[in-house]
Every structure is written in C-alpha cells, then in structure tokens.
C-alpha cells in the first residue's frame, strides 16, 4: 500500500494547538523510572491519533533534506505543523532509499539512539544489531474492538488490524492469534515498523476518534505494541533469508536478475547463476563482517564504561 502522494501539494497541519496543561500536570505526579529516564504511568487509550490522510504534509524538514520523522507527528500531537524540522508523512520507498545513504543503523527513523541489545520486555527503541520489521501487537481484546456496541469476530478483528496498520506503510504479513489475544505484523521496511510502533502504541482498533476519547476518559487500556522476538520457526527464518537475498539481488543490473526465457542461451543462464551465487556469498560475508564488527564495538563500549 503506497501512501497518499497528495501530501506533497499541501503544508502539514497542526495536530495539537497547544500542549495540554492537564497532561503536563498529570505527568509530574508519576514516579520516575531511573533506569529508562521516563515517567511511570498506567497504560490507557490515547486521545490523540495520527490521521495519515489529513495530517501528512510538507514541513521544513522536507526543505532541509532530513531523513528523520517527527515522533510527535506519529503519535498525532505535533504542535508545529509545517514549521516542524522533521518529516510529517508516512515512510515511503524514497525515504527508505535516503535512509540507506544518509542514515545510520545506530539511530531509528526518529533519530533516537538504539542500543546493543533489546530490552527484556522488547519495548523501547530497539537494537542496532537487528533490523526488526515485525511488531508484536497485544491486548487486542481490551482495545475497544467493537462495532455498533458488539464485539467483533475473529475475521473482523484481523481485517481491522490489516486496515489500521496497513495505512502506515506496506506490509508483508499479518498473523492474528485470537486464542492468544495478539497479532504479529511484519512490514516491508524496518523504518516503517519503527514508525508504526509509535503510531499505534496505546491506540484502539476503533474507527471513531470520539470513541477513543470516551475510552481514554474511562482509563481503558490500548494496544500493546512492541518488537517481536525472532521466530524460531524454520519457515520464518527461510523467509528472512529470502528477503535478504532479494534485497541484495535488487542491487544488481536488471539484465542479471531477469528470469531467463526458453530462448535464452546457456551462456546467459550461466552468467545469471554466477551473479546470483556471488550475491549469496556476499550476503554471508556481509553478515559475518557486520556481526564481528558489532561484537568488537560492544567490547569497546564495555571497556569505556569501566
């Protein structure tokens, strides 16, 4: 699913006129978690939500050429609008291409620093040792999955998940487990997963913002969105390997990646097979080199901390 390109023709709108004094006061009454430097609070349905069709637009970030997205825009509460120094639109292929050139695996799509390891609860920014594209979505049963006052059935819930997460960027797979009250959403690019993780955190699956506001006032719990752990299923690992190989194959000239026709000579087939073999060897070499470099960096970091 490609995002609406009409946002390029308009300025980004202000999502929130001003910061609520009630929210600021409420934040100051909570305890501080000294390990993560954040306020501790109970989860509830957010009264703010990103509307990609209405909120997307041009900002100062587009003029400056930044690759970083606005975190507050993703959460539906940026008060700067077109004056914001960060991007206000859904991540597109061009953003991913720019990230590969100008970005760094040490930062997420919002410019926040990643860590060597994921948190134990798989929340937070994530790890720079792994480009995770799969999100774990929990607490679905309590996230206001209702229609006309009645609970949705399993098929309707999965359809709602596909719609709500699909409008934030192209997805590869969605797996809903009603007996576990959770789902797994896998995106095509990791920057899209990073964006969607923040955009759908503490949201509901309702289509009405008015219903979200009512649920927020009732302290109802929203969606629990965090990083999915690596799937031990061999089929899942095969899919991951295939994705990496396809990404490297896309870097080859078109004539070396086209499927040979029946009239293609044996020489052409041999050249294509050799190119594919080189790409697979390159993938294994890059993986080993990257792993070794990251391990070396972790050792240096531990020495610095000592």
From Swiss-Prot:
Keywords annotated in UniProt: Cell cycle, Metal-binding, mRNA processing, mRNA splicing, Nucleus, RNA-binding, Spliceosome, Zinc, Zinc-finger
GO molecular function: pre-mRNA binding; U6 snRNA binding; zinc ion binding
Chief site of localization: nucleus
Annotated region described as Disordered, given as residue ranges: 251-277
Zinc finger (C3H1-type): 64-91
Domain RRM: 133-230
Superkingdom of the organism of origin: Eukaryota
GO cellular component: post-mRNA release spliceosomal complex; Prp19 complex; U2-type catalytic step 1 spliceosome; U2-type catalytic step 2 spliceosome
GO biological process, one term: positive regulation of RNA splicing
Similarity field: Belongs to the RRM CWC2 family.
Subunit structure: Associated with the spliceosome.
Reported function: Involved in the first step of pre-mRNA splicing. Required for cell growth and cell cycle control. Plays a role in the levels of the U1, U4, U5 and U6 snRNAs and the maintenance of the U4/U6 snRNA complex. May provide the link between the 'nineteen complex' NTC spliceosome protein complex and the spliceosome through the U6 snRNA. Associates predominantly with U6 snRNAs in assembled active spliceosomes. Binds directly to the internal stem-loop (ISL) domain of the U6 snRNA and to the pre-mRNA intron near the 5' splice site during the activation and catalytic phases of the spliceosome cycle.
UniProt domain comment: The C-terminal RRM domain and the zinc finger motif are necessary for RNA-binding.
Protein name: Pre-mRNA-splicing factor CWC2
Source taxonomy: Eukaryota, Fungi, Dikarya, Ascomycota, Saccharomycotina
């Amino acid at each position: 699913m490609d995002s609406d390109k009409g946002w390029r023709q308009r300025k980004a709108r202000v999502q929130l006129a001003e910061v609520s004094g009630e929210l600021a006061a409420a934040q100051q009454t909570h305890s501080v978690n000294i390990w993560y430097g954040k306020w501790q609070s109970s989860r509830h349905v957010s009264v703010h939500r990103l509307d990609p069709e209405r909120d997307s637009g041009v900002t100062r970030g587009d003029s400056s050429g930044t690759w970083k997205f606005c975190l507050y825009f993703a959460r539906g509460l940026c008060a700067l609008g077109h004056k914001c120094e960060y991007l206000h639109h859904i991540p597109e292929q061009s953003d991913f291409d720019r990230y590969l050139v100008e970005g760094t695996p040490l930062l997420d799509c919002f410019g926040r620093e990643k860590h060597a390891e994921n948190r134990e609860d798989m929340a937070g920014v994530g790890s720079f040792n792994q480009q995770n594209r799969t999100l774990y979505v929990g607490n679905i049963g309590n996230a206001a999955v209702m229609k006309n006052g009645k609970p949705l059935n399993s098929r309707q819930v999965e359809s709602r998940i596909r719609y709500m997460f699909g409008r934030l960027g192209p997805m590869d797979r969605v797996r809903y487990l009603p007996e576990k009250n959770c789902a797994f959403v896998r995106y095509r690019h990791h920057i899209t997963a990073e964006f969607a993780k923040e955009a759908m955190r503490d949201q509901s699956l309702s289509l009405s913002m008015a219903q979200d506001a009512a649920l927020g006032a009732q302290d109802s719990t929203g969606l629990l969105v965090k990083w999915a752990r690596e799937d031990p299923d061999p089929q899942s690992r095969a899919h991951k390997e295939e994705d990496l190989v396809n990404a490297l194959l896309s870097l080859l000239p078109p004539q070396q990646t086209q499927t040979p026709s029946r009239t293609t000579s044996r020489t052409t087939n041999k050249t294509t097979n050799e190119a594919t073999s080189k790409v697979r060897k390159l993938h294994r070499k890059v993986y080993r080199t990257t792993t070794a470099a990251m391990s070396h960096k972790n050792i240096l970091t531990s020495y610095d901390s000592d």
